[in-house]
Curated annotation (Swiss-Prot):
Keywords: Chromatin regulator, DNA-binding, Metal-binding, Nucleus, Stress response, Transcription, Transcription regulation, Zinc, Zinc-finger. This is SWI/SNF complex subunit SWI3C homolog. It comes from Oryza sativa subsp. japonica (Rice). Residues 24-39, 675-695 have a biased composition (Low complexity). GO terms for biological process: chromatin organization; regulation of response to water deprivation. Residues 1-68, 667-702, 760-784 are annotated as: Disordered. It is found in: Nucleus; Nucleus, Nucleoplasm. A zinc finger (ZZ-type) spans 355-409. The lineage of its organism: Eukaryota, Viridiplantae, Streptophyta, Embryophyta, Tracheophyta.
Length: 784
């Protein structure tokens, strides 16, 4: 292919020539060659397109014309998406700002994910969005991950380190308390990401050689061991500043001192150690004075050698804590707890209650009900203003936060807690509005429609609900006297002592209504049915209409207190008092009616249960009958199949016997015998012998044996004939090819006859005293 051998310079020359003359109409040959060149040199064209900014001979108007008149759709898409202008933003990591004509699909995915996060739709759309690294606030020079082949893992420590870190936002305050090996550990607010049991991403950036997997001696477990040793050393005396010289005894060999120094300086930088230490020196001024040196000429020279380590790259002040180590020790000493573990938990709770507060992780303002919770760190939350202004915490972006609306959560949680008064209002609303849940929710007043429906479904359909609901006391106090009236319990039995059976006032339904008995009957008629309500009304009426001596005596006793109760006296048409019903009697009647209704409902329930059992048994019997009918039908079909099989077997045996008889008749015919002179010819020329037919078994010629042999074979039950019948039966069952009777010939070889009938004779001797032992010619036409 001559086009494959073209050089890169030729392809670039063609590209530039075509780009300078985009409007010229090329000839068909040139157009086809240009298309072929573009197809063959796609890589060269891409490299030329990348380096098109270096071509100073092409004017800007030519580029515009190229965008308008280019015929290659791939080039049009590439040039239309990204403009050639580029502005460098950062040298490390390399970041370039480019102008685009239309957003990339990844940008659209990020915008959709941010909108869903702001709307509180969950993290389903966030999972599909690309991973972003925020370089706007505090992360312009922070690497989120270090690859195993990164330059920072080089063994040469004299080279400048590629680790660059931006100072965190200092958050002055009381700090955050954490548990570390049974002791309290106070860290700054901006170091709340630290956890003794895990390794944070910022820690992996400081000592990446422990997490690259290149060295078997440097493992994450070893890093955690060194880090925890340093922190434990500091917690022995938090008021004293821990220096690197004091930590050198924590490692066994000098090769680990460099890693230990980086760990100590990192922990000191973030305030994980020396946060409560007093007398700390302003590290920024100390480093500034140590890096500047005045030359004899009077010029100031900046020393770059110390900047090779992390110590020179992080230049910011130490975080200061408003608390002192004595405050923590005083709190620990004042706690009067016997159990050590329980004391630590209680002390931790006290310190957290005093030091920590629910505030924004960036501006430290108290969080409102609407805020944004981090998906990476559980203790990081932002207020609405900081989130919308993109003031994120180090290592976070907008996709790492989830919208939290406290009002919605509170309303959902409140839907699970119902007071007795709200439950009563719900039952009253159901009784009043039937199934109109909007009116029921308005009647309750404090719950929504869905919460009312959910709570009503969860209510137990038992009398235990009424026992747990507290109803305000009635205006008339309850009396234990029953005036001798019989009391019916839930089972309908009569009890002699009413005070042991009558429940208190707060356990009777509709006790505060003007007529408790009628209210109960009406409720049962609408909820349970007219028959249950009729039994309740009948029992209550029987109690109210009992006329005995005790009632007459009670009328005289209650005459002084007429009109005081909630139930007025009944008067006749003449204006006289006809009867007076005491509140206790009304309660007794309501309870008896309720017991009768419960008994009636129980009877109906038992009747329905028996009906269900009867119907279930009927269904099962019908299914069993269907199964029996199917089994009977299958048995009949099986019987018919067996009969057909027997008939087919008899027909097969008859056909086999007929076939054997016909074959025997053909073989015993005198025309099959040949002169003896042909025997030598057949024996001398074995190739002239016709092959044995496939359908005739090897023992077929034995059917025409002489009488002495035949008699001998008959005396032993004809084994050869049985074998012949078995072979014929197998041939009929095997669906193999069938040969006509005319094709069956007797062509026994001399060796076969000698072996069967004269095994003692040599193979060269062929007796001709019997017709079966004489060989026949292959061209005998008398057979068939």
């Amino acid at each position: 292919m001559p086009r494959k051998a073209s050089s890169t310079s030729d392809s670039r020359l063609k590209w530039r020539k075509w780009k300078r003359n985009p409007t010229a109409s090329p000839s068909p040959s040139n157009r086809s060659s240009a298309a072929a060149a573009a197809a063959d040199h796609s890589d060269d064209s891409d490299s030329a397109a990348v380096n098109e900014d270096d071509d100073s001979a092409v004017p800007e108007d030519a580029d515009d014309e190229t965008l308008a008149g280019a015929e290659d759709p791939v080039l049009d898409l590439r040039e239309a998406e990204v403009l050639p202008s580029a502005e460098p933003v950062s040298a490390f990591p390399v970041a370039t700002r480019r102008v685009v004509n239309r957003p990339h699909p990844s940008v659209l995915a990020v915008i959709a994910a941010e909108r869903s996060a702001c709307a509180g739709e969950g993290s389903a759309a966030v999972a599909a969005a690309p991973v972003l690294e925020n370089i706007s606030y505090g992360q312009q020079q922070v690497l989120s991950g270090v690859l195993p082949d990164h330059a920072s893992l080089a063994t040469d420590t004299d080279k400048p380190s590629t680790y660059v870190c931006t100072p965190p936002n200092l958050m002055e305050g009381h700090g955050v308390t954490k548990q570390f090996q049974g002791r309290l550990h106070v860290v700054p607010k901006h170091s709340d990401w630290f956890s003794p049991g895990i390794v944070h991403r910022l820690e992996r950036q400081v000592v990446p050689q422990f997490f690259s997997g290149k060295s078997p001696g440097n493992t994450p477990e070893k890093y955690m061991l060194l880090r925890n040793k340093v922190i434990a050393k500091y917690l022995e005396n938090p008021s004293k500043r821990l220096a690197f010289a004091e930590c050198q005894g924590l490692v066994a060999n000098t090769a680990e001192l460099y890693d230990l120094s980086r760990i100590v300086r990192f922990l000191d930088t973030w305030g994980i150690i020396n946060y409560l230490a007093s007398g700390s020196v302003h590290r920024g001024l100390r480093m500034a004075t140590s890096l500047l040196r005045e030359e004899p000429t009077g010029e100031l020279q900046l020393l770059t050698a110390p900047l090779k380590s992390i110590d020179g790259l992080i230049l910011f002040d130490r975080p200061k804590c408003n608390l002192q180590a004595e405050d923590i020790s005083s709190l620990a000493s004042n706690s009067e707890v016997v159990d050590f573990d329980a004391g630590l938990a209680e002390l931790d709770g006290k310190i957290r209650e005093r030091l920590s507060e629910s505030s924004c992780s960036y501006c430290l303002q108290p969080l409102t009900s609407l805020h944004y919770q981090s998906l990476k760190e559980a203790d990081i939350a932002l207020c609405s203003d900081c989130f919308h202004d993109a003031r994120y915490i180090t290592g976070h972006s907008s996709l790492d936060f989830q919208r939290i609306d406290g009002d919605n959560d509170r309303s959902e949680n409140d839907g699970d807690s119902w007071t007795d008064q709200e439950t009563l209002l719900l039952l009253e609303g159901i009784e009043k509005y039937n199934d109109n849940w909007n009116n029921i929710a308005e009647h309750v007043g404090t719950k929504s429609k869905a919460q009312c429906i959910y709570h009503f479904i969860r209510l137990p359909v038992e009398d235990g609900l009424l026992e747990n609901i507290e109803v305000p006391d009635a205006s008339v106090p309850f009396r234990a006297e029953t005036n001798g009236y019989p009391h019916l319990d839930c089972n309908g039995s009569t009890s002699g002592n009413l005070p042991q059976k009558i429940p208190p006032d707060n356990q009777l339904p509709f006790i505060n209504s003007s007529n408790p008995v009628m209210s109960l009957v009406g409720f049962l008629a609408s909820a349970m049915g007219p028959r249950v309500a009729a039994s309740c009304a009948s029992a209550a009426l029987s109690v109210l209409t009992v006329d005995d001596d005790s009632r007459v005596n009670s009328e005289g006793i209650c005459s002084d207190s007429r009109g005081q109760g909630p139930h007025p006296n009944f008067r006749d048409h003449n204006g006289g008092v006809s009867s007076s019903i005491s509140p206790e009697k009304v309660k007794h009647a309501a309870m008896c009616g309720l017991s009768a209704a419960a008994t009636k409902a129980k009877l109906f329930a038992d009747q329905e249960e028996r009906e269900i059992q009867r119907l279930t048994a009927t269904v099962i019997n019908h299914q069993l009958k269907r199964l029996e009918l199917k089994l009977k039908q299958f048995a009949e079909v099986e019987t018919l199949l067996l009969k057909e099989c027997e008939q087919v077997e008899r027909i097969r045996q008859r056909i086999a016997s007929d076939r054997v008889r016909i074959v025997s008749t053909r073989l015993a015919s005198p025309g099959n015998s040949l002169p003896g002179g042909s025997t030598s010819t057949m024996s001398s020329n074995p190739m002239s012998m016709s092959p044995r037919p496939m359908g005739v078994p090897g023992s077929m010629p034995q059917s025409s044996m002489p009488a002495p042999f035949a008699n001998n074979m008959q005396g032993h039950g004809h084994p050869q004939m049985a074998f012949l019948q078995q072979q014929q039966r197998q041939q009929m069952l095997s669906f193999g090819p069938r040969l006509p009777l005319s094709a069956i010939q007797t062509q026994p070889s001399p060796q076969t006859s000698n072996i069967m009938f004269n095994p003692g004779m040599p193979n060269s001797v062929t007796p001709n005293h019997h017709q079966l032992l004489r060989s026949s010619s292959g061209n005998n036409s008398s057979v068939g």
